């Protein structure tokens, strides 16, 4: 947190930690309490149906604490709109987001990234292929893909998040590949042959950054929270950075 964020959160009479679009490790939650004071964790329903928060904010100061970039989620943009409608003062304090850290720590050049992709948990027999289709589109345009892993197997945003493991994410990509092949789609590269960089527990003491083929990365399930970069054709500097991060 920036000094501004700490000062503002500490000064608010009411503090809520939003616990479903991103998460803090338990030890970081304890540290947050030490830094800004006590807070209450709230999940998706209370943020998407924010009448309680809005009523509180009419007459008192409220801090909604969000891990990373506070305005990356549509829910938070909608909350700003609701405050504007009700003439409730709304201020944004920028945070450091894992998505920007992932790009810089990957060793790949930021201007060569295409559209960001999220791999969702499959719900029953439903498995969309659009995430892999976007990865292929980026790849065919020689653009790298930053891939975020789902946190919520239920899709409801009510229970404590359960971060997706690399093996699960890559297995889902391979199932998407199978569905595309069944439909007769031409694929530019097998999922197992993609080269990528797994970023684990970014900014924590346990941070690890490792590169290799998807078949290698799928075996890396240590750590807690992961994201993945699938690389397109790399230039010399990128290729050297990739080699320095190789799985050993």
Regions found by a protein language model. Give the residues of each.
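Fold-independent oxyanion-binding glycine-rich loops
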Residues: 18-20, 42-44, 67-69, 96, ...
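Class I S-adenosyl-L-methionine
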Residues: 1-89, 93
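Aromatic-residue detector
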Residues: 11, 16-26, 38, 76, ...
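Conserved active-site and cofactor/substrate-binding residues in soluble primary-metabolism enzymes
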Residues: 4, 27, 44, 48, ...
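Beta-strand/loop-alpha-helix module characteristic of Rossmann-like adenine-cofactor folds
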Residues: 90, 100-248
């Amino acid at each position: 947190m920036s000094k501004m964020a700490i000062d503002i959160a500490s000064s608010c009479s009411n503090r809520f930690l939003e616990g479903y679009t991103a998460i803090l490790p338990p030890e970081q939650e304890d540290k947050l309490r030490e830094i800004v004071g006590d807070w209450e964790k709230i999940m998706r329903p209370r943020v998407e149906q924010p009448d309680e928060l809005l009523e509180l904010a009419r007459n008192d100061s409220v801090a909604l604490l969000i891990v990373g970039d506070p305005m990356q989620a549509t829910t938070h943009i909608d909350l700003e709109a609701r405050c504007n409608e009700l003439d409730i003062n709304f201020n944004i304090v920028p945070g450091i987001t894992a998505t920007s850290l992932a790009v810089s720590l990957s060793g790949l050049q930021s201007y060569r990234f295409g559209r960001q992709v999220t791999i969702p948990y499959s719900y029953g027999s439903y498995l969309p292929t659009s995430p892999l289709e976007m990865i292929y589109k980026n790849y065919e345009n020689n653009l790298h893909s930053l891939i975020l892993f789902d946190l919520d197997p239920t899709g409801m945003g009510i229970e404590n998040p359960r971060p997706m493991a690399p093996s699960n994410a890559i297995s889902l990509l391979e199932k998407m590949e199978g569905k595309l092949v069944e439909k007769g789609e031409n694929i530019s590269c097998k999922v197992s042959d993609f080269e990528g960089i797994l970023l684990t527990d970014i900014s924590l003491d346990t941070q690890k950054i490792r590169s290799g083929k998807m078949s290698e990365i799928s075996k890396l399930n240590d750590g807690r929270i992961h994201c993945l970069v699938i690389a397109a054709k790399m230039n010399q500097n990128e290729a050297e950075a990739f080699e320095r991060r190789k799985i050993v």
